[in-house]
Amino acid sequence: MKKTSNRLHSLFAALAALILAAALAVPAFAVEGGFADLYYRMNDSAGVLTEDEDNELEDALEELSLRQSFDVTIATVESLESVDYDSMEAYADDLYDFCQFGYGSEMDGVLLLVSVGDRKWHISTCGYGITAFTDAGIQYLGEQMTPFMADGDYAGAFRTFVQWSDTYIDAARAGHPYDVNNLPREPLSLMLSLIHI
């Protein structure tokens, strides 16, 4: 009887260890094979969007991220002081890491952070995002978004970010990331080149 009790105890211990190991491994596999999906991709803490705009952008970010296997996220804060940070870059990087944004083992993705009260923005990249979003490309993207933000049209700025992010990822995957010598053509310069033909 004692042998059966010991075997049963050993079996339960082994089963408990197996269940614990499986439970701990599931989150690691989930991140390794895709997205952690712990937080919304549209985080409007500053409250600059209407509910409809927030939902529209969340859907657009979700669709883009899944289609590209690349996490595209946006966050707003009232000010750096409100989150107890001095640096946009430090807060954006910490937020990206804390929320476990990114796709796969390299955590491929991009985060646009906007501090409304400070009138500042920062783009944080990780994994393949570093290739897809070069410094020159980020500067160009900022030039496309800031007129909307200056007018208080944050939804317009964020729609622009989503659309250009899709283009940036495609360009990088085609082997031509937007950079100093390969920035998108301005519509006016394209028209002028057609006129000269």
Over which residues does each language-model region extend?
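Conserved small/polar residues in nucleotide/adenosyl-binding loops
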Residues: 195-197
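Folded, non-transmembrane soluble domains that reside on the lumenal/extracytoplasmic side of membranes
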Residues: 29-191
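Bacterial N-terminal signal peptides
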Residues: 14-25
